Amino acid sequence: MHGLLLAAAGLLSLPLHVVAHPQPSTSLAGRGVDLDAYRMADRSSYMSSDDMKLKQPAIASLSGGNYVDTATEVVKRMMPGMTFRMADDHYVGESGISHLYFRQTMHGMDIDNADFNVNIGKDGKVLSFGHSFYTGPAPDRAPVEKRDFSGPMRAFHGACKALNLPINADKATIQTMNEHEVMFVGTSGAMSDPQGKLCYMAKEDGTLALTWRVETDMGDNWLLSYVDAKETDKVHNVVDYVSHATYQVYRWPIPDPTEGKREIVENPWNLKTSPFTWISDGKTNYTTTRGNNAIAQANFDGGEDYLNNYRPNSKNLKFEYPYAPNMSPPKSYIDASVTQLFYSANIVHDLYYMLGFTEKAGNFQVNNHGQGGKGNDFVILNAQDGSGTNNANFATPPDGKPGRMRVYIWTKAKPARDSSFEAGTVIHEYTHGLSNRLCGGPANSGCLNGMESGGMGEGWGDFFATAIRLKPNDNRNANYVHGEWVNNSPKGNRLYPYSTNLQTNPLVYTSCNKYNEVHAIGTVWCSILYEVLWNLIDKHGKNDGPTPVFENGVPNDGKYLAMKLVLDGMAIQPCKPTFVQARDAIIDADMNLTKGSNKCELWKAFAKRGLGVGAKYDPKNRTGSKAVPKECQ
């Protein structure tokens, strides 16, 4: 195979120079390309704990041996005769659930969008599983035997042309990485050397396509483009690791600078979740905004370099710099901006760690100090990023590669406003990293690229930002609007406020039928989760402190319990989940964590907004339901 790749590359190393406008956009709109048209379909199935007992009792009764053997047996029984491999990112989560991930193979190559995840409960029995394995006709011969496909350089050319990417490959050469993967060396315009991988892809029409997966990190978009290996001018699907948004933002825990004053905090880290503090990686102690979890700096030109960019430095570790909302221009308070961004991101790291986003779950750290997972992947935090305005985004590559958060200046007020000072931006964007690492496993960052699954990615960000900002006197009548301060508008930037009042916010599951945009769908998902939040708070009370209190591994209040169940559900659900599957995963998370003691509170919350027992997913005609199980009526 090495010889075949190199031979094809040598014949097809065509000069390439594609020019595009460097305008950031979630859809490459500045280059005339709509990425939504290339989204993968949400095609996973999910077998919940309750469904499995009824439909697959033999699977439900599996136990004994180790969890790897049990999970492998599930895949063998459910998919007899199919070939697959186990990913190396399986782990036992903080809730005691073992999460294992498998990838379907064909003729020794991955089917890149065919995944199977199995969840083994604390009792050693199968809790649930989900999959998107391909079950259609298989090619009778391996492509390497027929040699009827084009080489990687032609596919690279096809991806750049179809997506109008500003990459110059006039002097590009191909470097073979392994049997099926190559690197394009000598290009310019991308933030790192593009890569190619020969793999299959299951198409929406039920057939299988041989593709070159071309990976290009363009900064505002980090793309996996599945180019047909025979017709290289055809791009089947595109996954974007970058999640873009314009969100409600607030300073931790203050919603925005209008609701509080800046104060000096001393040693704000939690040594249980950041044992090296925030300004050390266990090997080097820093006197700047750099540590094990994150590295923060100015990025005025919007470029890819960050190590050499400006960041405040204080030998006496006093990161105390002036800032007021009426200061202008933004560069005049860059020290305060970088410091605030660094503080907020580290706070989120520590909180999510407590809730279960640890090293083995794929969190963002340089030094995992022997706790599992892959290190060398802190979050790169770019303050006042010059690549855009009125936005923010987060790039989530697989575990072991740094995440990248860009926060911009907002120009909807005078003077302009810096979103580093609203922690909601950081919470929302960081949550993209959380959900992309948990869903499908730490090694698979492409599980939330469908329209409904991508919408949930946005909704989870809103949910965590909203739950964290709850005030001590709030009750279920509290309404929250996203984006008031940065947008300079009391209506914010969402369709409706988050509310438990159906007149204030009428969104239900079937509202998604009229939306074809991830932020709108995300607003529906967060509206549903907001009902979950208040049902659990009404039952268990609300901890207004900055961190959860656990009793036997379970948060003892409703707010943090809701956050914990939603986070656990991310790890349980299948790759490219639907609302229905994510609902079932949250209910299964509660079954594992509390033995189902909150089952009815959860079902009633989901049913209130149309995601009850009879809800069914169809991308164009979802069916709503307000029904709950008999035991909850």
Swiss-Prot record:
GO terms for molecular function: metalloendopeptidase activity; zinc ion binding. One of its GO terms (biological process) is proteolysis. Residues 22-245 form a propeptide. Residues 1-21 form the signal peptide. The active site is at E429. Its EC number is 3.4.24.-. Binds 1 zinc ion per subunit. Glycans are attached at N285, N592, N621. Zn(2+) binds at H428, H432. Its main location: secreted. The keyword Metal-binding applies. Keywords: Glycoprotein, Hydrolase, Metal-binding, Metalloprotease, Protease, Secreted, Signal, Virulence, Zinc, Zymogen. Its cofactor is Zn(2+). Disulfide bonds: none annotated. GO terms for cellular component: extracellular region. Secreted metalloproteinase probably acting as a virulence factor. Belongs to the peptidase M36 family. This is Extracellular metalloproteinase 5. It comes from Trichophyton rubrum. The lineage of its organism: Eukaryota, Fungi, Dikarya, Ascomycota, Pezizomycotina. The gene is MEP5.
